[in-house]
Amino acid sequence: MNLVEMKSGDRAVIKMLPEGEAAQRLEALGLRSGKEIEKISCMPFGGPVTVMLEGRHFAVSHSIAEHIEIEKAGSL
């Protein structure tokens, strides 16, 4: 499952990030494999996905969020 498919309000653990420059930018923000996040919202029409990590909110572009693989926290 990817971040876009996740329901708002659900928690999940990041399993895999996209490759390349996008991964470097996400990791610099603290979004790394193994980190638990909560999906706050997803804007319509391909807009950004907002997540919360360690009490901080981040907006991730829809195209990048499609490549962030997650595992729902309840299924760990």
Regions found by a protein language model. Give the residues of each.
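Compact, glycine-rich, soluble single-domain proteins
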Residues: 1-76
